[in-house]
């Protein structure tokens, strides 16, 4: 029972209590770039979750055999290999989305969330908790991405997953798309609002005044 509770805590903590974007402010670049549509945000979430979970698992499995002097290189090699697999799978099965994600799939290699969890958690923990931690941080990252993408696509184009939800003026409806929501600065504002909302729910995350 204790192990189950601990696993649940590891899995769900990255949503609100220790969100990699909202609290740690990591992975923000991709949050700006891939959140104009829900489908790209969803696929990016799956990609990051896969890479984070399995890089954590593999790093944890060999952590006692990695010389300290080359541990970062080994972690990078594992992460890069997983990213290549993800990139090839996306190109094979969802080529159009892969083109929209462009270089940001490859840049998962340098994503601070992935590297941070491998170094800070997987190097010190057993394989199963490390894997769960990777899944949790991928989901926490995706929680922000998908929330931001929901509002950007809905308000920016009147659509969700490419399907018209709000009747557009151009089609005789009442909604005029807000082009600002499709620009990168809108993601900054939305992430800021999310951080504000999370810190209302979790006051302990508010930094102490100097």
Curated annotation (Swiss-Prot):
Catalytic EC class: translocase
Topology relative to the membrane: Multi-pass membrane protein
InterPro entries per the UniProt record, alphabetical: NqrD, NqrDE/RnfAE
GO-annotated biological processes: sodium ion transport
Single GO molecular function: oxidoreductase activity, acting on NAD(P)H, quinone or similar compound as acceptor
Segments traversing the membrane: 10-30, 42-62, 72-92, 103-123, 131-151, 178-198
Reaction catalysis annotation: a ubiquinone + n Na(+)(in) + NADH + H(+) = a ubiquinol + n Na(+)(out) + NAD(+)
One Gene Ontology cellular component annotation held by this UniProt entry: plasma membrane
Compartments where located: Cell inner membrane
Chief location: membrane
Keywords: Cell inner membrane, Cell membrane, Ion transport, Membrane, NAD, Sodium, Sodium transport, Translocase, Transmembrane, Transmembrane helix, Transport, Ubiquinone
EC number: 7.2.1.1
Any one Pfam family match given in the protein's UniProt record, by short name: Rnf-Nqr
PANTHER family from the UniProt entry: ELECTRON TRANSPORT COMPLEX PROTEIN RNFE (PTHR30586), NA(+)-TRANSLOCATING NADH-QUINONE REDUCTASE SUBUNIT D (PTHR30586:SF1)
Function: NQR complex catalyzes the reduction of ubiquinone-1 to ubiquinol by two successive reactions, coupled with the transport of Na(+) ions from the cytoplasm to the periplasm. NqrA to NqrE are probably involved in the second step, the conversion of ubisemiquinone to ubiquinol.
Subunit: Composed of six subunits; NqrA, NqrB, NqrC, NqrD, NqrE and NqrF.
Family, similarity comment: Belongs to the NqrDE/RnfAE family.
Protein name: Na(+)-translocating NADH-quinone reductase subunit D
Source organism (scientific name): Photobacterium profundum (strain SS9)
Organism ancestry: Bacteria, Pseudomonadati, Pseudomonadota, Gammaproteobacteria, Vibrionales
